[in-house]
Amino acid sequence: MKTLVLVAVLGVASLYLLSSASEVQQLSPAEEEFRAFVSTFGGLFETEERGVDSEDCRAMFGGCGEDNDCCLHLGCKTTKLPPFANPYCAWDGTTGRK
């Protein structure tokens, strides 16, 4: 019984060492060059969507005057019953990147 437990513990330890050794993988020069190339484009792939990464966009249930005041995937809504005052930002039914 002691031998079986010892073998099991050694097996788990060897699997741990093998998995941690595979995580410590060095990048090839081509991979490093590709990552540097992609990072040079910086903001090229960023979109000009309303409210994306905008500090002045309004969050959920924040006051608004129009859809552009609200953050991404939020639209300016009003209550359906009178009074129609106090519009707020609410989910506009979209998901993902536009």
UniProtKB/Swiss-Prot annotation:
Its main location: secreted. GO terms for molecular function: ion channel inhibitor activity; toxin activity. Expressed by the venom gland. Residues 22-50 form a propeptide. The keyword Secreted applies. One of its GO terms (cellular component) is extracellular region. Residues 1-21 form the signal peptide. Keywords: Disulfide bond, Ion channel impairing toxin, Knottin, Secreted, Signal, Toxin. Pfam families: Toxin_12. Disulfide bonds join 57-71, 64-76, 70-89. It is found in: Secreted. The presence of a 'disulfide through disulfide knot' structurally defines this protein as a knottin. Belongs to the neurotoxin 10 (Hwtx-1) family. 27 (ICK-3) subfamily. Ion channel inhibitor. This is U10-barytoxin-Tl1a.
